[in-house]
Protein backbone atom coordinates (compact mmCIF):
# COMPACT_ATOMS: atom_id res chain seq x y z
CA UNK A 1 0.00 0.00 0.00
CA UNK A 2 1.25 3.46 -0.84
CA UNK A 3 0.28 6.48 1.28
CA UNK A 4 0.53 9.93 -0.33
CA UNK A 5 -0.86 12.04 2.51
CA UNK A 6 -2.28 11.60 6.01
CA UNK A 7 -4.34 14.15 7.90
CA UNK A 8 -5.77 12.42 10.98
CA UNK A 9 -6.47 14.67 13.96
CA UNK A 10 -6.12 13.76 17.63
CA UNK A 11 -9.89 13.42 17.97
CA UNK A 12 -9.86 10.66 15.32
CA UNK A 13 -11.32 12.67 12.43
CA UNK A 14 -9.43 13.03 9.18
CA UNK A 15 -8.36 11.53 5.88
CA UNK A 16 -5.66 9.55 4.09
CA UNK A 17 -4.73 9.47 0.41
CA UNK A 18 -3.87 5.90 -0.58
CA UNK A 19 -3.22 3.58 -3.51
CA UNK A 20 -3.33 -0.21 -3.42
CA UNK A 21 -0.26 -1.83 -4.97
CA UNK A 22 -0.81 -5.52 -4.17
CA UNK A 23 -3.80 -7.86 -4.14
CA UNK A 24 -3.57 -8.03 -0.34
CA UNK A 25 -3.94 -4.23 -0.15
CA UNK A 26 -7.48 -4.48 -1.56
CA UNK A 27 -8.43 -6.74 1.34
CA UNK A 28 -7.07 -4.15 3.80
CA UNK A 29 -9.02 -1.35 2.04
CA UNK A 30 -12.21 -3.45 2.20
CA UNK A 31 -11.70 -3.72 5.96
CA UNK A 32 -11.00 0.01 6.31
CA UNK A 33 -14.01 1.45 4.45
CA UNK A 34 -17.38 1.56 6.20
CA UNK A 35 -20.82 2.92 5.37
CA UNK A 36 -20.86 6.67 6.05
CA UNK A 37 -17.20 7.14 5.07
CA UNK A 38 -16.38 9.59 2.27
CA UNK A 39 -14.44 8.45 -0.81
CA UNK A 40 -12.91 10.78 -3.40
CA UNK A 41 -11.54 9.20 -6.57
CA UNK A 42 -11.31 9.47 -10.33
CA UNK A 43 -14.17 7.62 -11.99
CA UNK A 44 -16.01 7.23 -15.29
CA UNK A 45 -19.56 8.56 -15.76
CA UNK A 46 -21.86 7.97 -18.71
CA UNK A 47 -23.12 11.36 -19.94
CA UNK A 48 -26.16 11.62 -22.23
CA UNK A 49 -26.52 14.80 -24.31
CA UNK A 50 -29.39 15.93 -26.52
CA UNK A 51 -29.04 18.00 -29.69
CA UNK A 52 -31.41 20.74 -30.87
CA UNK A 53 -33.03 18.24 -33.24
CA UNK A 54 -33.92 15.93 -30.34
CA UNK A 55 -31.39 13.18 -31.02
CA UNK A 56 -29.37 11.90 -28.09
CA UNK A 57 -25.83 10.65 -27.81
CA UNK A 58 -23.86 9.25 -24.89
CA UNK A 59 -20.21 9.23 -24.01
CA UNK A 60 -18.10 8.04 -21.08
CA UNK A 61 -16.35 10.89 -19.30
CA UNK A 62 -13.55 10.81 -16.69
CA UNK A 63 -14.32 12.93 -13.64
CA UNK A 64 -13.34 13.30 -9.97
CA UNK A 65 -16.21 12.47 -7.60
CA UNK A 66 -16.70 12.57 -3.83
CA UNK A 67 -19.35 10.18 -2.52
CA UNK A 68 -20.72 9.29 0.89
CA UNK A 69 -20.60 5.48 0.93
CA UNK A 70 -23.95 3.70 1.29
CA UNK A 71 -23.06 0.19 0.10
CA UNK A 72 -19.82 -1.80 -0.22
CA UNK A 73 -19.27 -4.76 -2.52
CA UNK A 74 -15.93 -6.58 -2.65
CA UNK A 75 -15.00 -9.00 -5.43
CA UNK A 76 -11.96 -10.92 -4.09
CA UNK A 77 -11.46 -12.75 -7.40
CA UNK A 78 -11.16 -9.56 -9.47
CA UNK A 79 -9.65 -7.63 -6.52
CA UNK A 80 -12.17 -4.81 -7.01
CA UNK A 81 -14.23 -2.76 -4.57
CA UNK A 82 -17.54 -1.27 -5.71
CA UNK A 83 -18.58 1.67 -3.52
CA UNK A 84 -22.05 3.08 -4.12
CA UNK A 85 -23.12 6.39 -2.64
CA UNK A 86 -24.41 9.90 -3.23
CA UNK A 87 -22.28 12.66 -4.71
CA UNK A 88 -21.66 15.28 -1.99
CA UNK A 89 -19.58 17.87 -3.89
CA UNK A 90 -20.53 20.16 -6.78
CA UNK A 91 -19.56 18.69 -10.14
CA UNK A 92 -20.09 19.80 -13.76
CA UNK A 93 -21.15 16.30 -14.80
CA UNK A 94 -22.87 14.71 -11.79
CA UNK A 95 -25.60 16.48 -9.84
CA UNK A 96 -25.31 16.98 -6.09
CA UNK A 97 -27.04 14.06 -4.37
CA UNK A 98 -26.99 11.82 -7.45
CA UNK A 99 -25.99 8.18 -6.96
CA UNK A 100 -22.74 6.85 -8.38
CA UNK A 101 -20.61 3.73 -7.92
CA UNK A 102 -16.86 4.22 -7.60
CA UNK A 103 -14.76 1.19 -8.55
CA UNK A 104 -11.48 0.86 -6.68
CA UNK A 105 -8.73 -1.46 -7.90
CA UNK A 106 -4.93 -1.74 -7.52
CA UNK A 107 -2.92 1.29 -8.73
CA UNK A 108 -5.90 3.67 -8.47
CA UNK A 109 -5.35 6.62 -6.12
CA UNK A 110 -8.18 7.65 -3.76
CA UNK A 111 -8.91 9.67 -0.62
CA UNK A 112 -10.65 8.07 2.37
CA UNK A 113 -12.20 10.39 4.95
CA UNK A 114 -13.71 9.28 8.28
CA UNK A 115 -15.40 10.97 11.21
CA UNK A 116 -13.60 8.46 13.44
CA UNK A 117 -10.37 6.54 12.86
CA UNK A 118 -10.35 4.10 15.78
CA UNK A 119 -7.44 1.96 17.00
CA UNK A 120 -8.40 -1.02 14.81
CA UNK A 121 -8.51 1.24 11.72
CA UNK A 122 -5.07 2.67 12.48
CA UNK A 123 -3.64 -0.78 13.19
CA UNK A 124 -5.00 -2.07 9.88
CA UNK A 125 -3.70 1.01 8.01
CA UNK A 126 -0.20 0.76 9.47
CA UNK A 127 -0.14 -2.98 8.75
CA UNK A 128 -1.03 -2.33 5.10
CA UNK A 129 1.62 0.39 4.78
CA UNK A 130 4.36 -1.81 6.26
CA UNK A 131 3.81 -5.48 5.36
CA UNK A 132 6.99 -6.34 7.28
CA UNK A 133 4.94 -5.95 10.48
CA UNK A 134 2.82 -8.94 9.45
CA UNK A 135 5.66 -11.02 8.05
CA UNK A 136 6.81 -13.50 10.66
CA UNK A 137 8.86 -15.52 8.16
CA UNK A 138 11.78 -14.25 6.06
CA UNK A 139 13.58 -16.20 3.36
CA UNK A 140 16.74 -15.88 1.28
CA UNK A 141 16.97 -18.21 -1.72
CA UNK A 142 20.24 -18.01 -3.61
CA UNK A 143 22.79 -19.49 -5.94
CA UNK A 144 26.10 -17.92 -6.97
CA UNK A 145 25.24 -14.52 -8.46
CA UNK A 146 21.48 -14.52 -7.78
CA UNK A 147 19.52 -14.04 -4.55
CA UNK A 148 15.95 -13.17 -3.60
CA UNK A 149 15.22 -11.73 -0.14
CA UNK A 150 11.55 -12.34 0.69
CA UNK A 151 9.05 -11.68 3.48
CA UNK A 152 6.17 -14.11 3.92
CA UNK A 153 2.90 -12.72 5.32
CA UNK A 154 -0.19 -14.81 6.14
CA UNK A 155 -1.58 -13.90 2.71
CA UNK A 156 1.36 -13.63 0.33
CA UNK A 157 5.11 -13.67 -0.36
CA UNK A 158 6.72 -10.27 -0.93
CA UNK A 159 10.07 -9.92 -2.71
CA UNK A 160 11.91 -7.19 -0.85
CA UNK A 161 15.22 -7.36 -2.79
CA UNK A 162 16.64 -9.17 -5.80
CA UNK A 163 20.41 -9.27 -6.20
CA UNK A 164 21.65 -10.33 -9.64
CA UNK A 165 25.43 -10.11 -10.21
CA UNK A 166 27.91 -11.69 -12.60
CA UNK A 167 30.51 -13.75 -10.75
CA UNK A 168 33.81 -14.37 -12.65
CA UNK A 169 34.33 -18.06 -13.33
CA UNK A 170 36.77 -20.01 -11.21
CA UNK A 171 39.89 -20.79 -13.26
CA UNK A 172 42.82 -22.93 -12.30
CA UNK A 173 45.46 -20.74 -10.75
CA UNK A 174 43.21 -17.62 -10.99
CA UNK A 175 40.66 -18.02 -8.20
CA UNK A 176 41.06 -14.55 -6.68
CA UNK A 177 38.65 -12.82 -9.11
CA UNK A 178 36.03 -15.50 -8.46
CA UNK A 179 36.43 -15.16 -4.70
CA UNK A 180 36.29 -11.34 -4.87
CA UNK A 181 33.10 -11.57 -6.94
CA UNK A 182 31.51 -13.92 -4.42
CA UNK A 183 32.55 -11.67 -1.53
CA UNK A 184 30.95 -8.67 -3.25
CA UNK A 185 27.78 -10.72 -3.92
CA UNK A 186 27.47 -11.93 -0.31
CA UNK A 187 28.01 -8.38 0.93
CA UNK A 188 25.19 -7.06 -1.30
CA UNK A 189 22.81 -9.81 -0.11
CA UNK A 190 23.78 -9.21 3.54
CA UNK A 191 23.13 -5.46 3.18
CA UNK A 192 19.71 -6.13 1.62
CA UNK A 193 18.85 -8.64 4.35
CA UNK A 194 19.72 -6.23 7.19
CA UNK A 195 17.71 -3.46 5.52
CA UNK A 196 14.53 -5.46 4.91
CA UNK A 197 14.33 -8.13 7.63
CA UNK A 198 13.40 -7.17 11.19
CA UNK A 199 14.68 -9.96 13.44
CA UNK A 200 12.62 -8.54 16.31
CA UNK A 201 9.46 -9.44 14.36
CA UNK A 202 10.21 -12.56 12.32
CA UNK A 203 10.09 -15.94 14.03
CA UNK A 204 11.98 -17.88 11.38
CA UNK A 205 14.52 -17.11 8.63
CA UNK A 206 14.98 -19.67 5.85
CA UNK A 207 18.29 -19.58 3.97
CA UNK A 208 18.19 -21.97 1.01
CA UNK A 209 20.60 -22.83 -1.80
CA UNK A 210 22.32 -25.66 -3.62
CA UNK A 211 25.54 -27.00 -2.13
CA UNK A 212 27.46 -24.86 0.36
CA UNK A 213 26.42 -21.40 -0.89
CA UNK A 214 23.97 -21.02 2.02
CA UNK A 215 26.70 -21.84 4.56
CA UNK A 216 29.15 -19.35 3.04
CA UNK A 217 26.46 -16.65 2.94
CA UNK A 218 25.47 -17.32 6.56
CA UNK A 219 29.08 -16.87 7.70
CA UNK A 220 29.30 -13.59 5.78
CA UNK A 221 25.95 -12.34 7.16
CA UNK A 222 27.04 -12.96 10.76
CA UNK A 223 30.35 -11.14 10.12
CA UNK A 224 28.48 -8.28 8.38
CA UNK A 225 26.14 -7.86 11.36
CA UNK A 226 29.10 -7.87 13.78
CA UNK A 227 31.00 -5.29 11.72
CA UNK A 228 27.99 -2.96 11.66
CA UNK A 229 27.30 -3.10 15.39
CA UNK A 230 24.23 -5.32 15.00
CA UNK A 231 25.60 -8.58 16.34
CA UNK A 232 23.01 -11.36 16.35
CA UNK A 233 21.90 -12.58 19.77
CA UNK A 234 21.75 -16.30 20.55
CA UNK A 235 17.95 -16.07 20.23
CA UNK A 236 18.21 -14.42 16.80
CA UNK A 237 20.72 -16.99 15.52
CA UNK A 238 18.33 -19.76 16.54
CA UNK A 239 15.74 -18.33 14.10
CA UNK A 240 17.86 -19.24 11.05
CA UNK A 241 17.22 -22.49 9.22
CA UNK A 242 19.57 -23.59 6.43
CA UNK A 243 18.10 -25.92 3.83
CA UNK A 244 18.37 -27.02 0.18
CA UNK A 245 16.81 -25.22 -2.80
CA UNK A 246 17.10 -25.96 -6.50
CA UNK A 247 18.10 -22.36 -7.35
CA UNK A 248 18.06 -18.74 -6.24
CA UNK A 249 14.92 -17.92 -8.24
CA UNK A 250 11.81 -16.94 -6.29
CA UNK A 251 9.80 -19.94 -7.53
CA UNK A 252 12.29 -22.23 -5.74
CA UNK A 253 10.92 -20.89 -2.45
CA UNK A 254 7.64 -22.70 -3.03
CA UNK A 255 9.46 -26.05 -3.11
CA UNK A 256 11.37 -25.12 0.05
CA UNK A 257 8.19 -24.21 1.98
CA UNK A 258 6.58 -27.52 1.05
CA UNK A 259 9.35 -29.70 2.50
CA UNK A 260 8.27 -31.44 5.76
CA UNK A 261 11.13 -30.11 7.91
CA UNK A 262 10.42 -26.49 6.89
CA UNK A 263 6.63 -26.90 7.32
CA UNK A 264 7.25 -28.25 10.82
CA UNK A 265 9.52 -25.29 11.68
CA UNK A 266 6.89 -22.80 10.48
CA UNK A 267 4.13 -24.36 12.58
CA UNK A 268 4.29 -21.54 15.14
CA UNK A 269 4.10 -18.56 12.78
CA UNK A 270 1.22 -16.06 12.81
CA UNK A 271 -1.01 -17.87 10.30
CA UNK A 272 -0.52 -21.11 12.19
CA UNK A 273 -0.82 -19.26 15.51
CA UNK A 274 -4.46 -18.39 14.81
CA UNK A 275 -5.28 -22.00 13.94
CA UNK A 276 -3.49 -23.12 17.11
CA UNK A 277 -5.49 -20.64 19.26
CA UNK A 278 -8.81 -21.80 17.78
CA UNK A 279 -7.90 -25.47 18.27
CA UNK A 280 -6.95 -24.75 21.88
CA UNK A 281 -10.32 -23.03 22.41
CA UNK A 282 -12.26 -25.95 20.89
CA UNK A 283 -10.31 -28.44 23.00
CA UNK A 284 -11.03 -26.47 26.19
CA UNK A 285 -14.74 -26.45 25.36
CA UNK A 286 -14.59 -30.24 25.74
CA UNK A 287 -12.10 -30.60 28.59
CA UNK A 288 -12.46 -27.37 30.65
CA UNK A 289 -15.68 -25.65 29.47
CA UNK A 290 -15.54 -23.12 32.32
CA UNK A 291 -12.41 -21.60 30.67
CA UNK A 292 -13.81 -21.35 27.13
CA UNK A 293 -16.68 -19.00 26.28
CA UNK A 294 -18.08 -17.41 23.14
CA UNK A 295 -20.66 -14.71 22.42
CA UNK A 296 -20.08 -11.03 23.21
CA UNK A 297 -21.90 -10.93 26.57
CA UNK A 298 -20.03 -13.89 28.04
CA UNK A 299 -16.68 -12.70 26.71
CA UNK A 300 -17.25 -9.10 27.84
CA UNK A 301 -18.28 -10.27 31.31
CA UNK A 302 -15.07 -12.33 31.55
CA UNK A 303 -13.09 -9.27 30.48
CA UNK A 304 -14.64 -7.22 33.28
CA UNK A 305 -13.20 -9.78 35.70
CA UNK A 306 -9.74 -9.48 34.02
CA UNK A 307 -10.04 -13.16 33.13
CA UNK A 308 -9.19 -13.20 29.40
CA UNK A 309 -5.93 -14.86 28.46
CA UNK A 310 -6.61 -15.04 24.69
CA UNK A 311 -9.30 -13.21 22.71
CA UNK A 312 -10.39 -14.56 19.32
CA UNK A 313 -12.27 -12.07 17.09
CA UNK A 314 -13.46 -12.35 13.48
CA UNK A 315 -12.55 -9.34 11.32
CA UNK A 316 -16.12 -9.33 9.95
CA UNK A 317 -17.30 -7.88 13.29
CA UNK A 318 -15.31 -4.71 12.58
CA UNK A 319 -17.18 -4.35 9.27
CA UNK A 320 -20.53 -4.05 11.08
CA UNK A 321 -22.78 -1.39 9.54
CA UNK A 322 -23.97 -0.40 13.00
CA UNK A 323 -21.30 1.94 14.39
CA UNK A 324 -22.04 1.04 18.02
CA UNK A 325 -21.56 -2.67 17.29
CA UNK A 326 -18.12 -1.99 15.86
CA UNK A 327 -17.21 0.30 18.74
CA UNK A 328 -17.99 -2.30 21.40
CA UNK A 329 -15.66 -4.82 19.74
CA UNK A 330 -12.94 -2.17 19.35
CA UNK A 331 -13.27 -1.35 23.07
CA UNK A 332 -13.11 -5.07 23.92
CA UNK A 333 -9.88 -5.56 21.93
CA UNK A 334 -8.26 -2.46 23.46
CA UNK A 335 -9.25 -3.54 26.98
CA UNK A 336 -7.89 -7.08 26.61
CA UNK A 337 -4.58 -5.72 25.28
CA UNK A 338 -4.33 -3.25 28.18
CA UNK A 339 -4.65 -6.24 30.54
CA UNK A 340 -1.80 -8.04 28.70
CA UNK A 341 -4.11 -10.54 27.06
CA UNK A 342 -3.38 -11.92 23.59
CA UNK A 343 -5.65 -10.90 20.71
CA UNK A 344 -6.05 -12.86 17.47
CA UNK A 345 -8.05 -11.13 14.70
CA UNK A 346 -9.15 -13.83 12.27
CA UNK A 347 -9.54 -13.19 8.54
CA UNK A 348 -12.88 -14.30 7.12
CA UNK A 349 -10.93 -15.30 3.99
CA UNK A 350 -9.32 -18.17 5.92
CA UNK A 351 -10.96 -21.43 7.02
CA UNK A 352 -10.20 -20.72 10.69
CA UNK A 353 -12.03 -17.38 10.38
CA UNK A 354 -15.09 -19.08 8.90
CA UNK A 355 -15.05 -21.58 11.77
CA UNK A 356 -14.86 -18.80 14.37
CA UNK A 357 -17.74 -16.96 12.65
CA UNK A 358 -19.94 -19.99 13.38
CA UNK A 359 -19.24 -19.37 17.08
CA UNK A 360 -20.56 -15.75 16.89
CA UNK A 361 -17.12 -14.50 15.77
CA UNK A 362 -16.09 -13.68 19.34
CA UNK A 363 -14.55 -16.18 21.77
CA UNK A 364 -12.14 -16.21 24.69
CA UNK A 365 -9.80 -18.54 26.52
CA UNK A 366 -9.81 -17.59 30.22
CA UNK A 367 -6.96 -17.46 32.71
CA UNK A 368 -9.14 -19.17 35.32
CA UNK A 369 -12.53 -20.97 35.34
CA UNK A 370 -15.75 -18.89 35.58
CA UNK A 371 -18.57 -21.45 36.02
CA UNK A 372 -21.14 -18.75 36.90
CA UNK A 373 -20.96 -17.32 33.36
CA UNK A 374 -23.15 -20.16 32.10
CA UNK A 375 -26.06 -18.72 34.09
CA UNK A 376 -25.94 -15.44 32.16
CA UNK A 377 -27.54 -14.91 28.72
CA UNK A 378 -25.11 -15.29 25.80
CA UNK A 379 -26.48 -12.31 23.87
CA UNK A 380 -28.23 -9.06 24.67
CA UNK A 381 -31.64 -10.45 23.69
From Swiss-Prot:
Alphabetical keyword list: Cell cycle, Cell division, Cytoplasm, Meiosis, Metal-binding, Mitosis, Nucleus
Q: List the GO molecular function terms.
A: metal ion binding
Q: Name one GO cellular component term.
A: nucleus
Report the protein name in the record: Protein pelota homolog
One GO biological-process annotation of the entry reads: ribosome disassembly
State the Gene3D superfamilies in the record. Answer: 3.30.1330.30, eRF1 domain 2, Pelota, domain A
Coiled-coil zones: none
Similarity annotation: Belongs to the eukaryotic release factor 1 family. Pelota subfamily.
* Role: Component of the Pelota-HBS1L complex, a complex that recognizes stalled ribosomes and triggers the No-Go Decay (NGD) pathway. In the Pelota-HBS1L complex, pelo-1 recognizes ribosomes stalled at the 3' end of an mRNA and engages stalled ribosomes by destabilizing mRNA in the mRNA channel. Following ribosome-binding, the Pelota-HBS1L complex promotes the disassembly of stalled ribosomes, followed by degradation of damaged mRNAs as part of the NGD pathway.
**Family matches, as SUPFAM superfamilies:** Dom34/Pelota N-terminal domain-like, L30e-like, Translational machinery components
Q: What cofactor is this protein dependent on?
A: a divalent metal cation
SMART domains named in the record? eRF1_1 (SM01194)
Main location class: cytoplasm
Oligomeric and partner information: Component of the Pelota-HBS1L complex, also named Dom34-Hbs1 complex, composed of pelo-1 and hbs-1.
Localisation: Cytoplasm; Nucleus
Q: What InterPro entries does the database record attribute to this sequence?
A: eFR1_2_sf, eRF1_1_Pelota, eRF1_2, eRF1_3, Pelota/DOM34_N, Ribosomal_eL30-like_sf, Transl-rel_pelota
Q: Name one Pfam family in it.
A: eRF1_3
Q: Domain of life of the organism in this record?
A: Eukaryota
